[in-house]
């Protein structure tokens, strides 16, 4: 049986100044997943990002951290997907989510972009919204005028702990997600 998910994308912004910001929660997840799978990232200019290949028992899974800024993430996703002939429904995108309380997780296929510029660009470049999303809750600042500053700043120590806990819990669901056991993954991830 081969893997159902063939590419996992973590969204974030490149550069030291963004490393610890809420908007980079997808990168945090992908770094942990690469460590768990003993996969090493390498800069790949033709894919506009850092790429790692995880050789798993049921086939390779590609890990991608776009080196474009968030609003150009689709360029990297589409380049890797086209090169390796990966269909949108074989892609998992892991990203920060304002509309979910800090530390909570949601998993879904398709849907709107919720104003997330990375998702908007991925949808535009793939021509569809039908890819999987692992949404890591970062909470909302309470006022939409504060959103940009909120996502581009470091979380408090308590919020960082909650996000790290969500990443750890999400990693436990990865085997089910990769193998297409959607109901099991959803039930686990959506439980408190």
Swiss-Prot record:
Domain of life from the UniProt record: Bacteria
Pfam family, one: Pept_tRNA_hydro
Residues the record marks as site: Stabilizes the basic form of H active site to accept a proton: 96
GO CC, one annotated term: cytoplasm
Site (Discriminates between blocked and unblocked aminoacyl-tRNA): 13
CDD domains: PTH
EC class of the enzyme, as a word: hydrolase
EC id: 3.1.1.29
Family: Belongs to the PTH family.
Protein name, entry field: Peptidyl-tRNA hydrolase
Source organism (scientific name): Neisseria gonorrhoeae (strain NCCP11945)
């Amino acid at each position: 049986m081969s893997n159902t998910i063939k590419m996992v994308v973590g969204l974030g912004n490149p550069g030291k100044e963004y490393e610890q910001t809420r908007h980079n929660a997808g990168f945090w997840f992908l770094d942990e997943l690469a460590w768990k799978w003993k996969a090493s990232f390498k800069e790949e200019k033709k894919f506009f990002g850092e790429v790692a290949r995880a050789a798993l028992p049921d086939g390779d899974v590609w890990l991608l951290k776009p080196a474009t800024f968030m609003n150009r993430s689709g360029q990297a996703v589409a380049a890797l997907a086209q090169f390796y002939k990966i269909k949108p429904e074989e892609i998992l995108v892991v990203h920060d989510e304002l509309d979910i309380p800090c530390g909570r997780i949601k998993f879904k296929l398709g849907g709107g972009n919720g104003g997330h510029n990375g998702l908007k660009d991925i949808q535009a470049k793939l021509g569809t919204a039908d890819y999987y999303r692992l949404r890591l809750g970062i909470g909302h600042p309470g006022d939409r005028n504060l959103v940009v500053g909120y996502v581009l700043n470091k979380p408090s120590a308590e919020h960082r702990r909650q996000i790290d806990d969500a990443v750890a819990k999400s990693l436990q669901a990865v085997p089910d997600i990769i193998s297409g056991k959607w109901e099991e993954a959803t039930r686990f991830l959506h439980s408190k």
